[in-house]
Curated annotation (Swiss-Prot):
This is UPF0738 protein BA_1211/GBAA_1211/BAS1118. Belongs to the UPF0738 family. It holds the Pfam family UPF0738.
């Protein structure tokens, strides 16, 4: 089973940010937010975790969409015309940015990308 939702673009609303994902075979109605984010250094992405009873699904947010995350708004992902709030995304990313800053363990390319956008 495919376990990744790939974000392709960002839409801004008055008080919200919508990460627009490519169409997916993943059924998002049964998923819930896990309030946790991982780092994908190879693809310069943050991975927000969604889950259901049997699996984890990763919402891959590429570096090309990070700049919009600097706004203090509610963030959602839209998959197959369904929007789901990515609860705690901003706080998780802020925590990761603190850990990534100057940390070669994440790889020079990721560190540079994070520092350019968030610092």
């Amino acid at each position: 089973m495919q376990n990744k939702i790939q974000v392709k673009s960002v839409e801004k609303r008055e008080n919200a940010l919508i990460f627009c994902a490519e169409n997916s075979e993943i059924e998002v109605k049964g998923l819930s937010a896990r309030n946790h984010v991982l780092v994908d250094s190879d693809n310069l992405s943050f991975l927000y975790i969604l889950e259901n009873e049997s699996s984890f699904i990763y919402v891959s947010i590429p570096h090309t969409c990070w700049e919009a995350m600097n706004n203090d708004v509610v963030m959602f992902v839209r998959v197959n015309d369904i929007e789901m709030e990515l609860e705690g995304l901003k706080e998780e990313v802020e925590y990761l940015v603190e850990n990534i800053e100057g940390n070669a363990n994440y790889g020079e390319e990721l560190v540079t990308a994070v520092e350019k956008v968030f610092l």
